Design a protein with these regions (language model features):
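Short, acidic loop-to-helix structural element flanking the phosphoryl-transfer center
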Residues: 105-132, 169
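Asp-based, Mg2+/Mn2+-dependent phosphohydrolase catalytic module
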Residues: 2-23, 96-98, 130-236
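N-terminal helical cap/lid subdomain that shapes the substrate entry/recognition surface
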Residues: 16-118
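Alpha-helical elements of Rossmann-like donor-binding domains used by nucleotide-donor carbohydrate transfer enzymes
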Residues: 39-43, 82-89, 122, 170, ...
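Short intrinsically disordered, low-complexity coil segments enriched in acidic
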Residues: 1-3, 55-56
Length: 236
């Protein structure tokens, strides 16, 4: 399936220029699904005034995005501590009745044990370009998940390394340096038109959003519906 907003000239540039592919850990490598994620959201519903699963999942995603976007390198804290801070701030608002430490354990379980994308193994096997992961959370989570699923990745880069989340360019610039590629030689597959895609763009990296459900039809960013369609457009 072709990217509708691409012309052939842009496709030719991608095919011949791309030397490295970067994937968002959350959303792309591990979609928000699976027993661990469902258990976390269900528990959140039972222990708060968030009325149902969809409402709670949306609240968590959007609130965490806001906290990350409002964070700067001057007041950066790790994702775990940011989530702790978020639930401490919002405890009364959502009438949270469970210990925040239990929330953190459940989030950690999501990051380590959630099922990976059904496409990922095939994507890694077929890609002729090296593939890297960029993550808001510590590298250990992605490393454990990859080992658990017997998958090889060329490297994982955490926002902790640069003390800035993915809405800033620093993590992408760091990833380029470590991967040994120029910005015009990299392609980033992201998850959020308000968080990581703007950061990648600031770093000068060609970026697309993996829009599996068609949620971003009005976005200014290029979209793909699957990782397999990306390989097709890269001539692989």
């Amino acid at each position: 399936m072709k990217w509708s907003c691409y012309n052939m000239a842009v496709l030719e540039v991608l095919i011949y220029m791309t030397k490295a592919i970067f994937l968002s850990y959350t959303g792309v490598v591990i979609p928000r699904r699976g027993n661990e994620y469902r258990q976390f959201i269900d528990t959140l519903v039972k222990n708060s005034n968030l009325r149902d699963y969809e409402h709670a999942a949306k609240w968590f995603t959007e609130t965490l995005r806001t906290y990350k976007c409002n964070s700067s390198s001057d007041d950066y804290v790790s994702e775990e501590n940011l989530i702790r801070q978020m639930f401490e701030d919002k405890r009364d608002e959502i009438r949270l009745s469970m210990p925040i430490e239990k929330v953190l354990v459940m989030v950690q379980n999501c990051l380590i044990y959630s099922p990976i994308s059904d496409e990922l193994a095939g994507f890694l096997a077929l890609s002729r370009r090296p593939v890297y992961i960029i993550s808001d959370c510590a590298c250990d989570y992605a490393t454990i998940e990859m080992k658990r699923n017997h998958l090889h990745i060329h490297g994982t880069f955490s926002c902790d390394s640069v003390q800035a989340y993915r809405n800033y360019p620093q993590i992408f610039e760091y990833a380029l340096q470590k991967a040994g590629v120029k910005k015009e030689e990299a392609l980033y597959i992201g998850e959020d038109a308000q968080l990581d895609l703007p950061g990648a763009r600031q770093a000068g990296i060609t970026s697309v959003i993996l829009d599996r459900r068609g949620d971003y039809q009005g976005t200014e960013f290029r979209r793909i519906r699957s990782l397999s369609s990306l390989l097709a457009n890269l001539g692989e």
